[in-house]
């Protein structure tokens, strides 16, 4: 399991990040969308998915 940082801009152009533990980047995105209401409403607003080593 790896740690991923995911980032996005909201409608006010404010940048946000969340950290997720997952087996791969696809699973990290799924977890982030489950955890963040904005990403549920705007699922394709993610612009950064980075594995933290």
Predicted regions and their residues:
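Short aromatic-glycine-(Arg/Gly/Cys) micro-motifs in beta-strand/loop hairpins
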Residues: 1-16
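A short, exposed loop/beta-hairpin motif centered on an aromatic-Gly-Thr core
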Residues: 13-27
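Short, mixed-charge low-complexity intrinsically disordered segments
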Residues: 15, 33-53
